[in-house]
């Protein structure tokens, strides 16, 4: 496996994934660089959506493909925004609108009930018909702030606080965030599976 297509059109995700995969002996190519458009995410779970994206990119390019599907799960909101995190405030996706809607939904929720987690599923398809895709998941526990903090990252980063470090994901430097994040946990699990299979 010399080339790997990242099946995402999300610039923030692409930057994060490229940084996390930098040590692998692979040429990482974003799907857009190969003329692959985003595919509708019609799955009912994170795993289904990641598989849809990876299969689409692998089918179009003929290359192995890695896809992530992720979201923010807020306990007090019954798991919302969850699978619909990117489109929580409607389409087209708008991180500021999503954050504003989330903070409004959480306005009356006390501090002790503001628990949340980022959750990610990463899928690797070695070829379009791969019958045994490698699937890994990761989560990052935190709490929802009462106001945005920080300017780094993307998505819900300004409103997701890591209580251990006392920083939102948007306040962290890239190295710290890429060590703690749900995507980092999932990628570490995936890399372990790859080594176990000698890929």
UniProtKB/Swiss-Prot annotation:
* Name of a matching Pfam family: Ham1p_like
Q: Recall the taxonomic lineage recorded for the source organism.
A: Bacteria, Pseudomonadati, Pseudomonadota, Gammaproteobacteria, Lysobacterales
Residues that bind substrate, according to the entry? Answer: 8-13, 70, 154-157, 177, 182-183
List the GO cellular component terms: cytoplasm; cytosol
Write out the residues that bind Mg(2+). 69
Identify the species of origin: Xanthomonas campestris pv. campestris (strain ATCC 33913 / DSM 3586 / NCPPB 528 / LMG 568 / P 25)
Concerning its family, UniProt says: Belongs to the HAM1 NTPase family.
Q: What class of enzyme is it?
A: hydrolase
Annotated protein name in UniProt: dITP/XTP pyrophosphatase
Q: Does the keyword Ubl conjugation apply?
A: no
Q: Which reaction does it catalyse?
A: XTP + H2O = XMP + diphosphate + H(+); dITP + H2O = dIMP + diphosphate + H(+); ITP + H2O = IMP + diphosphate + H(+)
**Function of the molecule:** Pyrophosphatase that catalyzes the hydrolysis of nucleoside triphosphates to their monophosphate derivatives, with a high preference for the non-canonical purine nucleotides XTP (xanthosine triphosphate), dITP (deoxyinosine triphosphate) and ITP. Seems to function as a house-cleaning enzyme that removes non-canonical purine nucleotides from the nucleotide pool, thus preventing their incorporation into DNA/RNA and avoiding chromosomal lesions.
Q: Which UniProt keywords apply?
A: Hydrolase, Magnesium, Metal-binding, Nucleotide metabolism, Nucleotide-binding
Cofactor(s) listed: Mg(2+)
Co-factor note (free text): Binds 1 Mg(2+) ion per subunit.
GO MF annotations, alphabetized: dITP diphosphatase activity; ITP diphosphatase activity; metal ion binding; nucleoside triphosphate diphosphatase activity; nucleotide binding; ribonucleoside triphosphate phosphatase activity; XTP diphosphatase activity
